[in-house]
Amino acid sequence: EFARRVTKLPGIGNLAVRRKIFRKIIDGLGGHLRLIICGAAPLLPETAAGLNDFGIVTIQGYGLTETSPVVAAERPEDLAAGSVGKPMPSVEVTIENKDENGIGEIVVKGPNVMMGYLDQPEETANVIKDGRFYTGDLGKFDDEGHLWITGRKKNVIVMKNGKNVFPEEIESIIDKLPYTSESMLFTREKHNELVLWVKIVYKPEYLEDTGVTFAEFVQTVRGVLAAINEKLPKYKHLHRFLLTDEPMIKTTTQKVKRNLEIEKINQQWQEELCYNNSI
């Protein structure tokens, strides 16, 4: 909070002053750290904002191998913590098939876009149309032109009322909890409607460090998820949660293999190997 106030004071909201005021923090990070560039995975907005407030310029960017690779990036003079900044020069970024919140698929056009996948014409045709590359990522632009990534198109959950749920939106909230290692949303059918469940991989050391029993821990999680529900529209409400300390199945790039996880959940559910709790 003090950092926020310092950066807003007239005449001293500059890097040199911030680095001097927060010298102890910077020294704790080695003393010479001036710039952080983050890509591949999102950085929590509060983390980026905090580092910038301390005088360590923290920039997020976005790109893919198919786009050589940078599509957009923050600039030191134009930071928007949580976004991936604005498109690079000569790169055109549009949002296709927007929903009511302005979220749609990110499409890229420019000299940085690949010619195609080697010897894979069908795969190339699926992602490149009229020279425009369909990334499969979902995002939106804010009023200042900053690009925000909201998830992957293939991960979108379409409810029976036609509403879209972007699992990463809710998972990112749950993943911030001190006892959460990772989480994943999925659906179950109830009274001919789809409802949301969440699998939470918890940190066993949290129970050891706090001294709470597992039963007490379950009640804590239930209460926190109920509080999260209060801030979400009804169709995004979580109905049940599964607790486990077993890591999820991931790709080599540490992305959760959702389909395999759902198969695993179905098996555990039948064999009663997971803790199933209502909210």
Where in this protein do the model-derived segments appear?
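Conserved C-terminal "lid"/linker of ANL adenylate-forming enzymes
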Residues: 184-187, 226-279
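Short, internal active-site loops enriched in acidic
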Residues: 42-43, 189-190, 203-204, 244-250
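Extended hydrophobic secondary-structure segments that form protein cores and membrane-embedded regions
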Residues: 35-37, 198-199, 240-244
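Conserved AMP-binding/adenylate-forming
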Residues: 13, 17-147, 153-156, 176
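Alpha-helical "lid/cap" subdomains adjacent to substrate-binding clefts that gate access
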Residues: 1-34, 199-229
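AMP-binding/adenylate-forming catalytic core of the ANL superfamily
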Residues: 110, 115-116, 138-234
